[in-house]
Amino acid sequence: MKEENLCPCDSGKTYVTCCEPYHKQHNAPTAEALMRSRYSAFVFGLVDYLFETTHPNHRAKNLKADIASTCKGLAWTGLDVRDVWQGGEKDKVGKVTFHASFVQEGKNGVHVEHSRFKRFGKAWMYVDGEVKG
């Protein structure tokens, strides 16, 4: 990816100044930053990153295979963060509601999720999400 390319998380920043540092083992400072970096990881098919940023207590047996299947089956086309509750640099928990647009088998769709995040040591981790609609 070229340095000037915008980040797929729709932050308005370039990928190298937005999600790439998190993908290269830097902890996201907030729950929203982690959620955006996970969206970008789905766009790029970064299965290991998505697995590693899922809270250890919430890693299902087939999680890596499920992530890989999702990455291959959907073309993500946009992210709209709708609401953020806590999840700041000094918080221990956070919630982010977002709409993620995608194309699957030539049809447009929107994934609406209310995600929960929790600190694990110094790192924000994805716990789970309530999918709407």
Model-found features: residue ranges?
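Short, low-complexity N-terminal intrinsically disordered segments enriched in polar/charged residues
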Residues: 1-37
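Beta-strand-connecting loop/turn residues
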Residues: 5, 92, 122-123
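Short helix-adjacent coil turns
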Residues: 38, 42-49
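Short solvent-exposed beta->alpha transition segments
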Residues: 52-81
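Surface-exposed, charged secondary-structure patches
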Residues: 70-107
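Short beta-strand edge/turn micro-motifs at domain boundaries
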Residues: 110-133
